[in-house]
């Protein structure tokens, strides 16, 4: 039997595993023997040696032995059993908050005890609370572990000891089988066999470097981390290659439409925009679907890039669909494209949840017959009732939360007569390069790394909420004297939407009393979409001076006259989200300000994070720092398809390995396609997300 087949060996083949234990193991993702072997320890304890009490250090785990000096029960609100031991070098106190008479009687003065636990500082001597212990009888030798003791992530009702016993059985089975090494030597830079790596990591020898293990730096760990990242990358490459097996209509400009459109604009595209448009045009002339991600910082001009991509399809007599995450943003896009495209007789339709009844039916008919060449909307565009006449390009805006699976579904939606639409995905949330190389390995990536001229930098200040009165006066000055508009953003992270709405309403009431001369609007997540839309449009049309809002405005309308933003409890938000919010101002040519208001005292980490935002306007620098501080799951806003399942690797810790992995993956999938399939099966277990590719 080879390890490739171990995923077919049921857990019930192990002694002691019945239905109840199987169900508990399933809760932690263990369904077969291979899962069990890949369920590696999260840390280790050294129970292989006795440490003298005099040499103990607080906040670390040790095995000690000593003779009982005293055994006392302190009766208070809850009784505590305290046992002092001495080994001749010093003393230590063992404390038990849950105990019975049998335990108390076993600690007779003069008895020898072996104990293991975390050492804490005590008033008179070090202490261990609730240690694991053993009474050593009649000078019997003390039995110590031969390897480091693994600690696994587990679930209720599944003890560490049970997991260790099951792993011991799996390792014993591993010794009996011939394991075919899937990875060719030239693709294994760490030179550990899989068998050696698994054995060492489940049962490390006592002389191993614990520090290396804790940091994920041991060659045995690196071997598995490398292979897992390689498998994920191969799976994404497979999606990419799979896409190239599909047919798409090559789109060349048929007329001078692009030149005529550019001539109507009051500005010139930046060099970065021209470069990205060129990337897109090179993709669109191919006979397989484009899958391109365009990253551009807030205000970098992604909409113009989308317009030029759309015109290529429209010039070929085809349809374009643009999907935005909110109705507000979708309507803004629809209005922009109508304004830009009207001189050329191009019809732009829009479809969202609020378009109902006869209007909806009329819009659906236009889409079906091709009367509209471009359709803008929310995810409503991809409901079953929507039929496109001849869809050749799908543009997804602000959808970095889309996983591979959704991208594949969109491809299927636009299929017609064996041809599939090209896809352009745009995000204003800069994704750290290492993350993009992993999460978006199935996409080609372009970056708009230049802001249009005339954009003024935003001055960011970090202020304690104790200075709230000053800030309110600053808002008054901006709105009354400078005739500008302002945002006041309330945040209640990890609270319910109800509480967040109540907090926003309370702040709106306070500001309405403090600033009676201003027209103040309110937007929060509990409002109906139409109510939110109406308030946002009033703000856009300058009927409101100040908008009190929750983070629903992170992706929102373009209001060039808004030049001041106050963000309450800024320390509670991630850096990338703060950067997105800040991007709502600084859209005109007036100097703009963002005030990050925090609740004191501010911890060191929060201080450091807010300083990053104060000192940098570069979304890519900010996203790298955000990744360091919060990790990949948080930065992406959701556990990404294909990333959430990492068992051994850690994207933050192991990010330096990713470029090497990507290099190996490209070579391996060409030279050894069968090996690539085996690796994907081993680590991803043929997950559904890749089966359509």
From Swiss-Prot:
This is ATP-dependent DNA helicase RecG. One of its GO terms (molecular function) is ATP binding. The wedge domain within the N-terminus inserts into the replication fork junction, where the lagging and leading strand split. Residues 482-628 form the Helicase C-terminal domain. Disulfide bonds: none annotated. It catalyses: Couples ATP hydrolysis with the unwinding of duplex DNA by translocating in the 3'-5' direction; ATP + H2O = ADP + phosphate + H(+). It comes from Haemophilus influenzae (strain ATCC 51907 / DSM 11121 / KW20 / Rd). Monomer. It is an enzyme of class 5 (isomerase). Residues 283-448 form the Helicase ATP-binding domain. Plays a critical role in recombination and DNA repair. Helps process Holliday junction intermediates to mature products by catalyzing branch migration. Has replication fork regression activity, unwinds stalled or blocked replication forks to make a HJ that can be resolved. Has a DNA unwinding activity characteristic of a DNA helicase with 3'-5' polarity. Involved in genome maintenance but probably not in phase variation, which contributes to virulence and disease.
